[in-house]
Each structure stands twice: as structure tokens, then as C-alpha cells.
Amino acid sequence: MAKYRPAHLPRGRGQKWSTFIRNHIDQTWAADWFTIVTLRFQVLYAFVILDLGRREVVRLGVTPTPSAQYAAQSFVEAVYDREDHAPRFLIHDRDSIYGADFRRRVKGFGTRCLVTPPRAPQANAFCERVIGTLRRDCLDNVLVLDDLHAERILREYIRYYHGRPHRGLRMQPPDGARWLPPVRPVPAKGVCSRSVLGGLHHAYGIAA
């Protein structure tokens, strides 16, 4: 039997999803939608695009009427904001909003869409985690009036988020600014504080 039995069982082709992401993290963006309920119980839809390598939110918009055109235009503007440096891959789920028109415009930048499996939010874990952070640290603590108000709040929070240390970046901030701990203890009077979102958060730095 040993003569006819294969020495090794056949393995599945290709690499694991986690391995693929790790190998291409600096070339990959991820996109997803989430909902926001206003003070008047209107449902708004926020669209977020995340650079996985930098953990940077490259685009975040809010609209009462989500569409493929809105999603595609958000991607285009994100690429232009990066001086035409488009990612190699874009991860998104199977929502019908990512239809032929969306994929065509994304492909025009040389970007390949990677569609996650059905009912598998963990396949877009980086984006899901950022959305969770936006909810817990921002939206769950404010009353949103409308889409313009939601965008203003989120823009202010994103500026704060991009400037604080991130564990996934070895305690460096997503905005790329090099952060180093002080060589010696800083006296309390040497620390300045900046209020974020009316005091919901505070950003700290060394006073000039």
C-alpha cells in the first residue's frame, strides 16, 4: 500500500487570506459602508476607504442616498488625493453597489477588486475595526443632525485619529509623522492640550 499511496496529501492551491494580506498590505485598500442614525431618525450611509499599510482613512463621506456612482467617485477622489498613487488591490464585500460600473472605474486605475466571501466580515477585518472605532470613540457620543454635520464631526475625529500612535504601526501615527517618546520626563507645565470634538477627546503635545 505504501507503494501506491501518495507521500503527501494534496494541499489547497494558493496562500491563506491572512498571508495574502500580510504580503500585500502596503498595496491594498479596503472599502465598506456603515449607517448613521440622526437625531430625527434619518438613516445616513457613510462610505470609508482605508489604506491597510498606513491604517489611514483615505476617504470618508456621508450621504443619504448610497449609490455605485458615489462609491466610485469616492475611490477616484481618494486616488487623486494620493497624487494618482492607486492601490494594487481593493477589498470590498458582495453588496450590489459594487457593480460593473464601480469595478470598471476602479480597474481604470489598474486596481483589482477583491470580493470577500458571503457573510465573512472578518475578511475585511481592518475596515471593520476602523468602523468600530469611529462608532465607539465618536458617533456613539454625539447627536448627529444631518449628513453635513456627520461629515464635519467625522473629519475632525479622523484628523485626531491620524495623529495618535497606532499599535499596528509600532506606536507610530497613520499620518506618517515620526513620533518619539521624550528622552527625559516632561514637567506638567511643558505639556499642552488641544480639545477635540468639544472635549470628547484631547490631543497632547510638548509646549513650544
Segments from the language model and where they lie:
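Charged DNA-binding/catalytic regions of mobile-element recombinases
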Residues: 1-208
